[in-house]
């Protein structure tokens, strides 16, 4: 399936969600994540700070930030820097996403688990992002377990057309499904 078609379809589905449906979905997805060995064993986790149309990460970050070391990406040109998450040290950055302040950069090799946002995922772990390639460039240098999270309708049955630079996730979690990619 073509990425632009997927983006249009998913955007339309997201626009129909109520705030209550969004909150229930986020709770369900992150409850599932908390039960996974990859999460339980990880201490250094790269998260994302959600956009309004994405599965919200705010409550999850608040719940676990005292027990796990979280990091957030910050746009730097065409790449993403990784910085420690401190709720009081965020500013509105590129694409109107809250990003960490400071210069305390972390190497991707030091991250044990990466929670990856996307527009959609297929059952092979392939993902459709927003089209800029930020996450693909960053994920290419990582050996960490990569977990994609989203709404049920973001997990599609059709195979996603991929390019040579696309980096799949290892696990996809939605409200009703957990898909583990075979390597």
Please name every model-derived segment.
Residues 32, 127-128:
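Short linear sequence motifs
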Residues 50-53, 119-123:
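Short glycine-rich anion-binding loops that position phosphate/pyrophosphate groups of nucleotides
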Residues 1, 5, 12-15, 101, ...:
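Surface-exposed, charge/polar-rich loops and edge strands
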Residues 48, 117, 175:
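Conserved residues at the C-terminal ends of beta-strands
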Residues 1-109:
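N-terminal active-site beta-alpha-beta segment that forms phosphate/nucleotide-binding
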Residues 39, 48, 95, 121, ...:
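Aromatic side chains
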Residues 131:
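Short polar/charged helix/loop
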């Amino acid at each position: 399936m073509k990425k632009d078609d997927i983006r249009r379809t998913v955007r339309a589905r997201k626009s129909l969600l109520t705030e209550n449906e969004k909150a229930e979905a986020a709770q369900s997805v992150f409850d599932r994540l908390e039960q996974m060995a990859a999460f339980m064993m990880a201490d250094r986790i790269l998260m994302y700070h959600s956009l309004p149309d994405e599965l919200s990460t705010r409550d999850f970050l608040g719940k676990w930030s005292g027990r796990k070391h979280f990091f957030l990406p910050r746009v730097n040109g065409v790449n993403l820097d990784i910085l420690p998450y401190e709720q009081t040290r965020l500013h509105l950055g590129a694409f109107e996403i809250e990003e960490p302040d400071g210069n305390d950069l972390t190497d991707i090799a030091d991250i044990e688990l990466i929670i990856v946002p996307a527009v959609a995922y297929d059952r092979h772990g392939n993902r459709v992002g927003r089209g800029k390639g930020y996450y693909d460039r960053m994920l290419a240098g990582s050996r960490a377990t990569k977990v994609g999270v989203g709404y049920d309708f973001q997990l599609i049955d059709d195979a996603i057309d991929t390019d040579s630079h696309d980096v799949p996730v290892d696990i996809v979690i939605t409200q009703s499904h957990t898909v583990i990619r075979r390597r």
